[in-house]
C-alpha cells in the first residue's frame, strides 16, 4: 500500500498546516499517510472507499482522515477536492484541545463523512484561500494566523454540519443524502422520503439535481450500482446475492443497469477485467 509522507507536502519542517488542491482528483489506489487531512469536495462525484467502506461523495462532502486511516478514490467524475493537511491535533504551536472539535470514534464507529451546504462551502473556500496565501511565510505571526484560520475552519464545519443545522432545505437535503447512504438497499418511496425530511417533492428533485447532476432515482440507482461494484471486487458473494443486497429485485435488470453504468458486466468486474488499481 502506498504511504504518503509529510515531508513531501508540508512547506517546511515546522509548518503545522498545508493546502493540497486536487483539481481534479483522478482515481487513486488505496493509501495512507503519516499526517491527518480534511478533504473538502468542491464539486463533481466519486466513490471514496474509507477503511474498506464505500461512500458516494459530491460537492459539499467533508471527510476527516486520520493518520492511520486508509482510503482510495474510484469512479471519479470531474471530482475536485481541496485537502487541508495537518500533522496531528496536538502538533500545533498556538492551539490546544483541537480534538474536541474533530469527529470522535464511539463504539467502533467513526463519523468520518460530513456534509455542508453551498453557502458554507463558499465560506470554507475563503478560509482555505487565506491559509494558502500565507503558506510561504514562516515567521511567528504568520504561523499563528494560519493556525487561527484552521481553528475557524473547524468551528465553521462543526457548526454547519448536518448534525447541528437542519434549519433550511439545503441542510435537510444533505441529511437525506446521508440517509440514502445507509438505506440504499431499501425500497424508496420518494413522496414518503420528501415528507420524512420536510421537503416538497419538487424541491427534492430540483436541489438533488443541482447538487449531484442526477434525478433522485438516477442518483439512487448509481449509489446502488457503486455499492454493488465494491462488493463484486471485495467479497465472495454471488452476483445474484449482491444484486439483492443492493436493492435490486431482479438480477437480470441489475446486470443490464450495471453494464450501462460502467461499460462492464458484473462478471467482468468480478474477474478484474476492468483493470482496477488495487
Curated annotation (Swiss-Prot):
Where is this chain's protein located in or outside the cell?
A: Cytoplasm
Q: Which UniProt keywords apply?
A: Activator, Cytoplasm, DNA-binding, Repeat, Rhamnose metabolism, Transcription, Transcription regulation
Q: Which GO terms describe its biological process?
A: positive regulation of DNA-templated transcription; rhamnose metabolic process
Record InterPro entries? AraC-bd, AraC_XylS_family_regulators, Homeodomain-like_sf, HTH-like, HTH_AraC, HTH_AraC-typ_CS, RhaR_RhaS-like_N, RmlC-like_jellyroll
One Pfam family, please name it.
Answer: AraC_binding
DNA bind region: 191-212, 239-262
How it assembles, according to the record, is:
Binds DNA as a dimer.
Q: What is this protein called?
A: HTH-type transcriptional activator RhaS
Amino acid at each position: 500500500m502506498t504511504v504518503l509522507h509529510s515531508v513531501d507536502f508540508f512547506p517546511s519542517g515546522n509548518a503545522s498546516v498545508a493546502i493540497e488542491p486536487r483539481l481534479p482528483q483522478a482515481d487513486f489506489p488505496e493509501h495512507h499517510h503519516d499526517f491527518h487531512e480534511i478533504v473538502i469536495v468542491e464539486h463533481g462525484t466519486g466513490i471514496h472507499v474509507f477503511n474498506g467502506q464505500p461512500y458516494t461523495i459530491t460537492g459539499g462532502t467533508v471527510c476527516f482522515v486520520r493518520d492511520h486511516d486508509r482510503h482510495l478514490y474510484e469512479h471519479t467524475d470531474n471530482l475536485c477536492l481541496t485537502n487541508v493537511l495537518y500533522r496531528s491535533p496536538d502538533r500545533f504551536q498556538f492551539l490546544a484541545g483541537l480534538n474536541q472539535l474533530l469527529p470522535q470514534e464511539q463504539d467502533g464507529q467513526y463519523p468520518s463523512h460530513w456534509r455542508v451546504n453551498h453557502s458554507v462551502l463558499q465560506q470554507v473556500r475563503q478560509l482555505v484561500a487565506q491559509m494558502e496565501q500565507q503558506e510561504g511565510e514562516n515567521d511567528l505571526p504568520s504561523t499563528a494566523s494560519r493556525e487561527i484560520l484552521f481553528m475557524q475552519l473547524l468551528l465553521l464545519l462543526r457548526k454547519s454540519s448536518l448534525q447541528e443545522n437542519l434549519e433550511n432545505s439545503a441542510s435537510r437535503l444533505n441529511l437525506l443524502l446521508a440517509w440514502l447512504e445507509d438505506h440504499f438497499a431499501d425500497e424508496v418511496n420518494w413522496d414518503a422520503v420528501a415528507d420524512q425530511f420536510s421537503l416538497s417533492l419538487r424541491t427534492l428533485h430540483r436541489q438533488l439535481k443541482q447538487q449531484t447532476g442526477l434525478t433522485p432515482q438516477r442518483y439512487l440507482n448509481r449509489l446502488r450500482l457503486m455499492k454493488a461494484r465494491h462488493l463484486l471486487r471485495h467479497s465472495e458473494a454471488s452476483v445474484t446475492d449482491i444484486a439483492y443486497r443492493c436493492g435490486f429485485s431482479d438480477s437480470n435488470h441489475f446486470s443490464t443497469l450495471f453494464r450501462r453504468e460502467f461499460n462492464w458486466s458484473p462478471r467482468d468486474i468480478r474477474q478484474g477485467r476492468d483493470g482496477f488499481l488495487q
